[in-house]
Amino acid sequence: MTEEILELYQFEACPFCSKVRQKFTELGVDFIARSVDPNDRTRVENVSGQTGVPVLVDPNTDRVMPESDDIVEYLEENYG
């Protein structure tokens, strides 16, 4: 079975988002960066029920996860 690509809802300048992007790179895991407009967070709210970033969407496990530390731990446990 082919794995689907993970999605990361994020801001480029967000240090918490940067931490998650670095973990993706460290693990060699492909992902799609979905940049969120800081003035219109409707898209991330529709996905996660909240307006904060980063938010990980893993279509392989149907997980939607906020919080950078939780995302990093999840990536290490499931894709490391």
Where are these regions (language model features)?
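GST-like domain detector, emphasizing the conserved glutathione-binding G-site
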Residues: 2-12, 18-80
